[in-house]
């Protein structure tokens, strides 16, 4: 590792510890030449996950985009942000665990809705109405019936 102060190539690691929820390692280093101390982070380089949208276009997976949709669906609902972040993390973990490079947006939406249904029924219906693009009231009513049947079990 090259020292940022004197550009000498020799450094030694003084301390290492997990960072960012275990997804990276924080290392405290010291230059062997000038004794300058600095911090580095080491993380796994993940292969980008590509989302295939309904129209066939492709874009890189964005956990922020899912979180924004969940926040919108949960507006004025008693759902903590940590719960929504947990849903996003679970969905991303499941998708990356499949080992595929591409995933359909439909699969992402279904995974999100599956988890959101266990958190808040109103938020679930809001999310579903946007995600499934309800065309008329009958589709909306059918979704509500399915939700009520699921809750009765």
From Swiss-Prot:
Keyword Ribonucleoprotein present in the record's keywords: the answer is: no
Free-text cofactor note: Binds 1 zinc ion.
Domain ATP-cone, chain residue ranges per copy = 49-139
**What are the protein's UniProt keywords?**
ATP-binding, DNA-binding, Metal-binding, Nucleotide-binding, Repressor, Transcription, Transcription regulation, Zinc, Zinc-finger
Q: Report the cofactors.
A: Zn(2+)
- Specify whether GTP-binding is a keyword of the entry: no
PROSITE patterns given in the database record:
ATP_CONE (PS51161)
Q: What Pfam families does the entry give? A: ATP-cone (PF03477), Zn_ribbon_NrdR (PF22811)
Q: Where are the zinc fingers (unnamed)?
A: 3-34
Top-level division of the source organism's lineage: Bacteria
A GO molecular function annotation here is: DNA binding
One example of a Gene Ontology biological process annotation: negative regulation of DNA-templated transcription
Classification via InterPro entries = ATP-cone_dom, NrdR-like_N, RNR_NrdR-like
Chain residue ranges for the region called Disordered: 1-22
Q: Which family does it belong to?
A: Belongs to the NrdR family.
Cross-referenced HAMAP family? NrdR (MF_00440)
Q: What is this protein for, i.e. what is its function? A: Negatively regulates transcription of bacterial ribonucleotide reductase nrd genes and operons by binding to NrdR-boxes.
The protein's matches in PANTHER family, at most eight in alphabetical order, are given as: TRANSCRIPTIONAL REPRESSOR NRDR (PTHR30455:SF2)
UniProt name for this protein: Transcriptional repressor NrdR
Query: Where does this protein come from, organism-wise?
Result: Halalkalibacterium halodurans (strain ATCC BAA-125 / DSM 18197 / FERM 7344 / JCM 9153 / C-125) (Bacillus halodurans)
